């Protein structure tokens, strides 16, 4: 997940000046990375992140924007848990922070999607919502056939809200449920690049696009090589089969074959795997490939007619299955 780490590291260091955007990012980050807990009758706000720089950014923003102190707890990897996790926790007046960030509505009920001020905000709020969601639970796969930018969501309402935010940015995202988890996915390569640019991950976009271009060039080269190999195999099989038919034609016609058709037939027998164009260059005087093909075609037609008259196997009988599979 090298690309994911690079994007999160870049986004966690991004400087955002507009207060509304910073608030939207914090609200989204808390919504996608954490939750509300009741501890000893008090509301506690928690967010679990996989990046230390993201945790530091969240802690700083909570203090500067909302005036709350938070603790960061480091949980090291072990057992089933992979990688170090960072838990940002606000215990003192957690309910106040939950209301300020829109995690609780005015009646004190948990908001299941994204807060109203984010959903009804401008494009910058949609960008910030996506930035917070990606820092919380986003992933970016390497460019390729199944490349994707994906965010794991706390529920279907949050997933739909994130899809709506992408739509306001002109980017198509889809929500789906995978193994019981709600996810929002962007699969189109151009859309992934556009979204990363909107989030502010400019260096990561350049790196991702470079890898994407390298992979596409490699894939195109492989396709062309396979195409050329297949064409060569088909041409070789056709040439071998044609030589077998010509050999049978000369047996049927014997000395009655016209000289100009005989020359073309003998060229084919002498150079069984050569292309028609190469046969034309070997002729004296040189001929076009169409002229060579025409003469061989007339030679075969004449021989097949003679075979029908004599009740003998025609030139096609000389072509075996092994020749076509070679």
UniProtKB/Swiss-Prot annotation:
Keywords: Cell cycle, Cell division, DNA-binding
Family: Belongs to the WhiA family.
Gene Ontology molecular function: DNA binding
Gene: whiA
Residue ranges of DNA binding: 275-308
The UniProt record lists the keyword Acyltransferase: no
Known function: Involved in cell division and chromosome segregation.
Species of the source: Saccharopolyspora erythraea (strain ATCC 11635 / DSM 40517 / JCM 4748 / NBRC 13426 / NCIMB 8594 / NRRL 2338)
Official protein name in the record: Probable cell division protein WhiA
Cystine residue pairs: none
Biological processes per GO annotation: cell division; regulation of sporulation
Keyword Protease on entry: no
